[in-house]
């Protein structure tokens, strides 16, 4: 009797019903020194790890330009790293420790790890510069991140935080501030770099609400640059073209009374 109701392959999706997964692509970032950082990008991803964003490129240029005082010998944490170019450039420029993180999705973390491995030959060994990769969800426990630091620095935290194109996620602003509070070293020279482009210009007021929230959380906010890029990342998107080409850069530091 059961055989009378055998549907066979009636409900099986036909071949080609689902679009094939996009293959990974590759992108290059040419450093001011002339060195080329080549990174792998995931084929597609809802968390945007498939792009080399303008803020990532400009962050890397800023890091390289200010490396002698900002990066060399320092401990650096990048959150929302995607392909990880700013982390890689930090390691190349002599950071003592660099921890590259993004959402703990296996594809994203594996892609970051491949990029870190591919850049190993560019990273100095004297003095040594270590580059680590791990998944991290904003606002969660930071002790696993601090575990990558040299033992004598774990209680203090990181000298530099890199936050490129993360403040677009408005509902995560509180978690971003929490992560800053728990990872940034409470010293005068410790700094969080917050760099972004308003790809959706009509949402810029919501994006900028991050900064008053950070001030309430104990940080000073200083705008350090506004750079107009040559090309739009998304040419057919709506909104003010000039804003969509502009990268804004801010430095956030602990208020004097909280160091």
UniProtKB/Swiss-Prot annotation:
Q: Name the EC number(s).
A: 2.1.1.-
Q: Where does S-adenosyl-L-methionine bind?
A: 53, 80-82, 102, 138, 164
Query: Could you give a single Gene Ontology term from the biological process aspect?
Result: methylation
Q: Which residues form a coiled coil?
A: none
User: What enzyme category does the UniProt record give?
Assistant: transferase
UniProt entry keywords in alphabetical sequence: Cytoplasm, Methyltransferase, S-adenosyl-L-methionine, Transferase
Q: Which domain of life is it from?
A: Eukaryota
The listed locations are: Cytoplasm
Transmembrane regions listed in the UniProt entry = none
One MF term in the entry's GO annotations: protein-lysine N-methyltransferase activity
Cellular component terms per the entry's GO annotation: cytoplasm
Which InterPro entries does this UniProt record tie to the protein? EFM7, Methyltransf_16, SAM-dependent_MTases_sf
Family assignment?
Belongs to the class I-like SAM-binding methyltransferase superfamily. EFM7 family.
HAMAP family given for it?
Methyltr_EFM7
| Biological function | S-adenosyl-L-methionine-dependent protein methyltransferase that trimethylates the N-terminal glycine 'Gly-2' of elongation factor 1-alpha, before also catalyzing the mono- and dimethylation of 'Lys-3'.
Q: What name does the UniProt record give this protein?
A: Protein N-terminal and lysine N-methyltransferase efm7
Question: Which gene is this protein's source?
Answer: efm7
């Amino acid at each position: 009797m059961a055989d009378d109701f055998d549907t066979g392959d009636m409900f099986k999706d036909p071949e080609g019903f689902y679009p094939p997964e996009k293959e990974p692509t590759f992108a290059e970032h040419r450093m001011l020194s002339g060195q080329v950082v080549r990174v792998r990008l995931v084929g597609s991803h809802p968390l945007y790890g498939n792009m080399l964003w303008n803020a990532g490129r400009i962050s890397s240029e800023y890091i390289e330009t200010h490396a002698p005082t900002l990066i060399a010998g320092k401990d650096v944490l990048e959150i929302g790293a995607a392909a990880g170019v700013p982390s890689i450039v930090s390691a190349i420029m002599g950071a003592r420790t660099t921890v590259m993180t993004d959402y703990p999705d296996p594809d994203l973390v594996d892609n970051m790890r491949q990029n870190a491995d591919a850049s190993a030959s560019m990273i100095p060994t004297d003095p040594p510069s270590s580059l680590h990769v791990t998944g991290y969800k904003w606002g969660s426990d930071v002790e696993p991140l601090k575990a990558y630091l040299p033992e004598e620095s774990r209680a203090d935290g990181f000298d530099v935080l890199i936050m490129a194109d993360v403040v677009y996620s408005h509902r995560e602003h509180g978690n971003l501030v929490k992560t800053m509070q728990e990872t940034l070293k409470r010293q005068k020279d410790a700094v969080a770099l917050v760099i972004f482009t308003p790809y959706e210009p009509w949402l810029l007021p919501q994006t900028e609400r991050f900064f008053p929230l950070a001030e309430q959380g104990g940080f000073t906010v200083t705008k350090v640059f506004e750079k107009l890029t040559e090309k739009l990342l998304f040419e057919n998107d709506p909104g003010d073209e000039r804003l969509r080409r502009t990268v804004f850069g801010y430095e956030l530091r602990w208020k004097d009374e909280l160091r």
